[in-house]
Amino acid sequence: MGKIKVGVVTARWNQEITSKLEEGAISYLEACEDVEIFAALVPGAVEIPLACQAFLEAGCDGVVALGVVIRGDTSHYDYVCNSVTDGVTRLMLDYKKPIGFGVLTTENEEQALARAGGDHGNKGEEAAQVTMEMIGLTQEIPAAMKTALMLAKKAPAKAAKKPAKAAAKTQKKKKKVRK
């Protein structure tokens, strides 16, 4: 098996925070064996799904999505959060490939900083961990299912003989009782 290809999509909006998320994600991925990292910057959070899609279409095994959306005085926050979340989720299901969701949706800048290497860890690193775990899982499940199917194909032949033998024994017992 070749190298695992992972895309990292980072929004430039709130770049003082997103750059820390990106550092955490890339640092984690660089420590993994046989991983090839591809990175792209996008203007804002709404553009994240399109860049994720481009990476998946180009053959990446998974993507890390990084951004920061901080609540303001208007409903724009809700639309952006829903748009990004729905877009990334749809891509995962359509492409059957994992996207680690490291898009912070916070009430203020302090909360975002706390999650970009502060008191609450680095959510960029965590998103990279999730991506790698899910790449492994999505590769293991088909292999395990194939093995299980192969075992199941062998098992019914043995199981079919057992009921026939049991039925024959039952018939012999019935004959003995009738005599």
From Swiss-Prot:
It catalyses: (2S)-2-hydroxy-3-oxobutyl phosphate + 5-amino-6-(D-ribitylamino)uracil = 6,7-dimethyl-8-(1-D-ribityl)lumazine + phosphate + 2 H2O + H(+). 5-amino-6-(D-ribitylamino)uracil binds at residues 13, 45-47, 68-70, 101. Pathway: Cofactor biosynthesis; riboflavin biosynthesis; riboflavin from 2-hydroxy-3-oxobutyl phosphate and 5-amino-6-(D-ribitylamino)uracil: step 1/2. (2S)-2-hydroxy-3-oxobutyl phosphate binds at residues 73-74, 115. Keywords: Riboflavin biosynthesis, Transferase. It is an enzyme of class 2 (transferase). One of its GO terms (biological process) is riboflavin biosynthetic process. GO terms for cellular component: cytosol; riboflavin synthase complex. Its EC number is 2.5.1.78. Belongs to the DMRL synthase family. Catalyzes the formation of 6,7-dimethyl-8-ribityllumazine by condensation of 5-amino-6-(D-ribitylamino)uracil with 3,4-dihydroxy-2-butanone 4-phosphate. This is the penultimate step in the biosynthesis of riboflavin. This is 6,7-dimethyl-8-ribityllumazine synthase.
